Amino acid sequence: MKFQGTNNYISTEDLNVAVNAAITLEKPLLIKGEPGTGKTELARQVSDSLGLDIIEWNIKSTTKAQQGLYEYDAVSRLRDSQLGDKKIENIGNYIKKGKIWNAFESKERSVLLIDEIDKADIEFPNDLLQELDKMEFFVYETNEIVK
C-alpha cells in the first residue's frame, strides 16, 4: 500500500514520504497549511487511491474532543427510567459512537479525516493526543476499552 499522488492530486515527494510513513507505521498524520491548499483533498485522494473508506469528522467552533470518541445521553436514560423503559438496563443504549470510535472499530483500514481542527477550542488537539497515539480509549460508562 503506497501513495504516490493521483491524476487529480499532484503531491510532492516529501508529502508522499510523510503519507507512506503514516500508513506503514499506522500512526496519525497531521497536515497543516493555509485554507485551500488541499489538505482535505489529500485525505480523500489517499483513501480513494488506496481503496480505503474515509471517515470524515468536520469540526466546528463548538465541537468538543469527546464527541469524536462517544457521547453519553444521561438525560434520555433518566427520562426512560422515569417511564419504566426496560432499555435502561443496558447503558450502551445511551452511548452514541463518535467518528474516532467508528474508525478504531472498523474491520478494514480506513482514513480518518478530522477536518477544520483549527476552528475548535485551543485545547482540542491536546485532548485527543493520547487516544490517537495509542489508538485506543476507555469508555467509562461501560467499563470497556475501544481499540
Regions found by a protein language model. Give the residues of each.
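Conserved helical "switch/dimer-interface" subregion of ABC/ABC-like ATPase nucleotide-binding domains
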Residues: 18, 127, 131, 140-142
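Walker A/P-loop
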Residues: 29-75
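Short gly/ser/thr-rich secondary-structure transition/capping motifs
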Residues: 10-11, 91-96, 136-140
